[in-house]
Regions:
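Conserved tyrosine-mediated DNA breakage-rejoining catalytic core shared by Y-recombinases
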Residues: 37, 46-78
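Short, histidine-centered active-site or binding-site loop motifs used for metal coordination
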Residues: 63, 96-98, 131
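Basic, Lys/Arg- and aromatic-enriched nucleic-acid-binding interface segment
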Residues: 2, 6-37, 41
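Active-site/catalytic core of tyrosine-dependent DNA strand-transfer enzymes
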Residues: 10-13, 73-122
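Short, basic (Lys/Arg/His-rich) helix/loop patches that form interaction surfaces
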Residues: 18-23, 27, 89, 111-131
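Helix-turn-helix-type domain boundary/helix-start signal
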Residues: 3-6, 70, 102
Length: 131
């Protein structure tokens, strides 16, 4: 089993976010979403645009099957509002470029996070690093 580690400094989090933002808004938002919510990637990828309209968000965690409700982080909510402008409410938030309306895969999310972190000098990462 590979060991993954957290990103240990705020500066590195900002650097990785900026790196992703320059490349792709969806990928930058995926990173921010993981950092601010602490959710598992399988739960993050289930979000649709309509799930971002309210002050709160609720999910049934895939692994634990527990129903939970959370407040949006103000910074994340601001970025979400910019990102979802003119998007279809039924569209996946982290939509794949392949297919009509599919979320990106867990594998793709892993590749996005790992590549960005490695390019910014952070190693031993995975999607769980965001938690």
């Amino acid at each position: 089993m590979n060991i993954v580690e957290p990103i240990r400094s705020q500066e590195k989090v900002k650097e990785i976010y900026t790196y992703l933002k320059e490349k792709n808004d969806r990928d930058a938002l995926l990173f921010l979403f993981g950092i601010y919510t602490g959710l598992r990637i399988s739960d993050i990828l289930k979000f649709r645009v309509r799930d971002c309209y309210n002050k709160y968000y609720g999910i049934r965690e895939k692994k634990t099957k527990k129903q939970k409700t959370y407040d949006w982080n103000p910074h994340l909510k601001k970025e979400l509002e910019k990102y979802i402008v003119e998007k279809d409410p039924d569209e996946f938030l982290f939509k794949s470029r392949k297919g009509k309306n599919q979320a990106i895969t867990r594998e793709r999310a892993y590749t996005i996070i790992k590549t960005a972190c490695n390019d910014c000098g952070v190693y031993n990462v995975g999607t769980h690093t965001l938690r």
